[in-house]
Amino acid sequence: MAETVVNVVGAGLAGSEAAYQLAQRGIKVNLIEMRPVRQTPAHHTDKFAELVCSNSLRGNSLTNAVGVLKEEMRRLDSLIIKAADAARVPAGGALAVDRHDFAGYITDTLKSHPNVNVINEEIESIPEGYTIIATGPLTTEGLAKEIVEITGEDQLYFYDAAAPIIEKESIDMDKVYLKSRYDKGEAAYLNCPMTEEEFDRFYDAVLEAEAAPVNEFEKEKYFEGCMPFEVMAERGRKTLLFGPMKPVGLEDPKTGKRPFAVVQLRQDDAAGTLYNIVGFQTHLKWGAQKEVIRLIPGLENVDIVRYGVMHRNTFINSPDVLSETYQLKGNDHLYFAGQMTGVEGYVESAASGLVAGINVAHKLQDKAEVVFPRETMIGSMAYYISHANNNKNFQPMNANFGLVPSLEKRIKDKKERYEQQANRALTYLENFKQTL
């Protein structure tokens, strides 16, 4: 019987990690990468895992969620983390890398691996057999059409327009109230009421806030029905007051009166630990977002776990179509990995590739599927993309402590809480490793 070869499409961070995990387990891999045959608007080299934005893989401390994620991956022999450690440059508490050395390490490792066959070509259809699609946010039109045919017409998004997401524990609950507009249905929103003076201060700050630059390949019409709130503000005060900050039907139960303006917060996860700021999709720089958001009553000291973004980002509606192993539901042979699955960030993308790669290897070796515990950062990300209860408006997410189950005992001090969650994650990981 011919040996099974797994196709990994895309040699970014997720695809490179998936290919490595497969190859290290004795599985033959066709790693299919269209560069340099066809370049993307964002890439400049023919190397694998090219970092197209920042050279930072973010925080390295275990009081930082992505730091915990990196440590979990380090303990699972992640190629991406090995490369990052080898190519590290000074960056304080962050793990930053020399881009050239980082990509070179990964490229050389995979090209010299006896189980990896590199194929440089653009494909417009999904290969037959076991396949991991890891083509990233700039997936070509032909392949995107094929993915739509397989997943369903409403399951592939081309623009990431997400409002900021915050931790519930950091909201000043004395200043907000639970209510749905006109009391329809259950009280599902936390409402931050504003006086006219507070609104004016907020409005002026929005007008003065600095927007992020837009890449050429992102300049498309994604504002229809999803306009950045700072663009609404530029059209005049009333645009916000008749839009996302409309107070009608949201009387404050403490006063019985209608506030001048209201910012609504909507639960974003099943556990109720994360909330998004309704209608606040934005192009503002992250520092500007924090300053503006902290002018909202009740959010003066809020912890933002995911800033608002609007950019080109091809991703699927994962809660409807993917399992926790990153496998397409109802299709034993097809897996996805990387930003396309709804994980956000370099490290998160690589982690999804690690999970997908291990699972395909286990399937071919007749071993049990690998579902990481939710207490781990790897497991919490896999659970989020497959179970998010906002599947009608699913948006990508990066690693954060709001995704893992709460500790049994509530700890008010944030640093201590994060340390305990980190220790728990690594304990669970070590125990889980014994089953791999």
Curated annotation (Swiss-Prot):
Its cofactor is FAD. GO terms for cellular component: cytosol. Disulfide bonds: none annotated. Its main location: cytoplasm. It is found in: Cytoplasm. It catalyses: uridine(54) in tRNA + (6R)-5,10-methylene-5,6,7,8-tetrahydrofolate + NADH + H(+) = 5-methyluridine(54) in tRNA + (6S)-5,6,7,8-tetrahydrofolate + NAD(+); uridine(54) in tRNA + (6R)-5,10-methylene-5,6,7,8-tetrahydrofolate + NADPH + H(+) = 5-methyluridine(54) in tRNA + (6S)-5,6,7,8-tetrahydrofolate + NADP(+). FAD binds at G10, A11, G12, L13, A14, G15. One of its GO terms (molecular function) is flavin adenine dinucleotide binding. Pfam families: GIDA. The keyword Transferase applies. GO terms for biological process: tRNA methylation; tRNA wobble uridine modification. Its EC number is 2.1.1.74. Keywords: Cytoplasm, FAD, Flavoprotein, Methyltransferase, NAD, NADP, Transferase, tRNA processing. The keyword Methyltransferase applies. Signal peptide: none annotated. SUPFAM superfamilies: FAD/NAD(P)-binding domain. Belongs to the MnmG family. TrmFO subfamily. Catalyzes the folate-dependent formation of 5-methyl-uridine at position 54 (M-5-U54) in all tRNAs. This is Methylenetetrahydrofolate--tRNA-(uracil-5-)-methyltransferase TrmFO. The gene is trmFO.
